Regions:
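Loop/turn-to-beta-strand initiation segments
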Residues: 104, 132-133, 165-169, 197-203, ...
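Short glycine-rich substrate-engagement loop in P-loop NTPases that contacts/grips substrate
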Residues: 84-92, 103, 128-165, 184
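A short, basic N-terminal segment
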Residues: 1-86, 231-232, 236, 242-250
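Pre-Walker A (pre-P-loop) alpha-helix and adjacent loop at the N terminus of AAA/AAA+ ATPase modules
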Residues: 66, 79-106
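Conserved catalytic network of the ASCE P-loop NTPase/AAA+ motor domain
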Residues: 98-101, 128, 161-164, 192-197, ...
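P-loop NTPase Walker A phosphate-binding motif
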Residues: 118-132
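Walker A/P-loop nucleotide-binding motif
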Residues: 102-121
Length: 250
């Protein structure tokens, strides 16, 4: 098959094309044509790889990367009633912007029902809308899936590898179980691998900084500060009494 970049066909196509198409074309020479082909191929491969990572991770847990309850969460529908919530929204938007082009880590700390999951899901939904892979999962589910892989006679290595391969991993309910040593070792493994490969980690917790440091260890907390990692406090009352989900009646 002829390479149109070398055969003169490219020049004839350009001669027949309107001037507006000429201005919009991403290439003007055979060399630029080849570079454009290679770049498009790389983009296509990267997109397929992202989709495969998301699919593999979701297959492990048997569900979508973001739970149904939070799939509609966005920055636009986050309700602001005080300066703390305004600050949390600003921080979440800034985190999402950084994740568009690089990586960063974050910890959202506060009592239940204060909107930590909403803003974490808003970040995740925005990334997923641009083709990135995201998993939001409780530490309890991570530990259960890891134990199940051992019970099935399989190594937990594949499970951890898939978990560490998504673009953004958000660990929810960190500290709820207080499983001490086993949980601490698992958190260390996950966060070490992800930060070493420049993949972002988020944590959602009811614990304050001192309590989380005692649970996760200084090593984990130090790694969470990498790449401009942030700690955001959600120190207001629960919004859940105001939440109502109406189901359609058939």
């Amino acid at each position: 098959m002829k390479n149109i970049a070398d055969s003169g066909i490219l020049a004839r196509i350009r001669k027949l094309a309107p001037q507006s198409a000429e201005r919009a074309a991403p290439f003007r020479t055979p060399e630029e044509w080849r570079e454009w082909q290679l770049a498009e191929g790389r983009r296509s491969c990267e997109e397929i790889d992202r989709q495969n990572r998301q699919a593999r991770a979701e297959k492990i847990f048997g569900r979508a990367g973001i739970q149904r309850l939070h799939r509609g969460c966005s920055f636009a529908n986050y309700r602001i009633q005080n300066d703390g919530q305004r600050h949390a929204l600003s921080q979440a938007k800034s985190i999402a912007s950084e994740l568009d082009t690089g990586c960063t880590n974050f910890v959202f700390s506060g009592n239940p029902g204060t909107g930590k999951n909403h803003l974490a899901a808003a970040i995740g939904n925005r990334l997923m809308n641009t083709g990135r892979s995201v998993i939001v999962i409780t530490v309890a589910d991570v530990m259960s899936a890891l134990h199940a892989s051992y019970d099935d006679g399989k190594s937990g290595e594949k499970f951890l590898r898939e978990l560490c391969g998504v673009d953004l991993l958000v660990l929810d309910e960190v500290g709820v179980q207080r499983e001490t040593r086993n949980e601490q070792v698992t958190l260390n493994q996950i966060i070490d691998r992800r930060t070493a490969s420049l993949r972002s980690v988020g944590m959602l917790t009811n614990l304050n900084h001192e309590a989380l440091t005692n649970l996760a260890g200084q090593r984990v907390m130090d790694r969470m500060t990498m790449n401009g990692g942030r700690w955001v406090n959600f120190d207001w009352g629960s919004w859940r009494p105001n939440v109502s989900y109406l189901r359609a009646v058939k």
